[in-house]
Amino acid sequence: MVSMRDLLECGVHFGHQTRRWNPKMKKFIFGERKGIYVIDLQKTLRYFRYTYNIVRDAAAEGKTILFVGTKKQAGGAIKEYAEKCGMPYVNHRWLGGMMTNFGTIRQSIRKLEVIEKMEEDGSIKLLTKKEALMLTRKKEKLLAYLGGIRYMKTQPDMIFVIDTVKEKIAVQEANRLRIPVVAPLDTNCDPDLVTYPIPGNDDAIRSVQLFCQEMAEAINEGKALREQDGEALANEEKEITDEEKKEVLDEAMSEEDFGEEQE
């Protein structure tokens, strides 16, 4: 579990410039130095350890925790640590409705499965070069936006977010659905929007990595406890039909921009 030394070495205590702050974060601020707010690491440590246990217990109950972080400093760590603990993630861009309109998102994921099946069974080779190219492009878009959540069959039970200001739509959707939000809170964030806050820097790469690493460790610890009960989850594959193949091909040939359509 995280230590005070970890927090200091990763710069978790460095907040934003004093002119860029949310007054609601005042209780988490230790002081100010050279125009930068300094976060109270004693409180960070306490909240960190409490939240670690919350996430561990959620994983032990078999719950799904969705990792969300799309900015440059977070994307790599979000993907790396979500995969290390076997959880879904969004690290490219949050598409509006990813949780509140999950049925439509699942339909798009199904299209990805259809294209991959066509590649696997060779039916894509029966198409013209242009048709095959358009399907390949569509697959790349689908993978970029939805690859991290392709195995998420239902809405998540909890979300872990890096930068709640940037990911405000994801946080809003979670709040609307009463899905608990876990997130580091920099000095410009609104703590009222987060169920389990951890005051700390959400911009520095090392700080972001530390948060992601600790959440992944908590989840793996919880999963280990669950495995003691001998429970296993089975993923059932749904057969791809010719009708689905034709539908996805027609859609790809229309040259629709998936990202803009879903935004």
From Swiss-Prot:
PROSITE patterns: RIBOSOMAL_S2_1, RIBOSOMAL_S2_2. Pfam families: Ribosomal_S2. GO terms for molecular function: structural constituent of ribosome. Keywords: Ribonucleoprotein, Ribosomal protein. It comes from the Bacteria. GO terms for biological process: translation. Residues 250-263 have a biased composition (Acidic residues). GO terms for cellular component: cytosolic small ribosomal subunit. Residues 223-249 have a biased composition (Basic and acidic residues). HAMAP family: Ribosomal_uS2_B. Belongs to the universal ribosomal protein uS2 family. This is Small ribosomal subunit protein uS2.
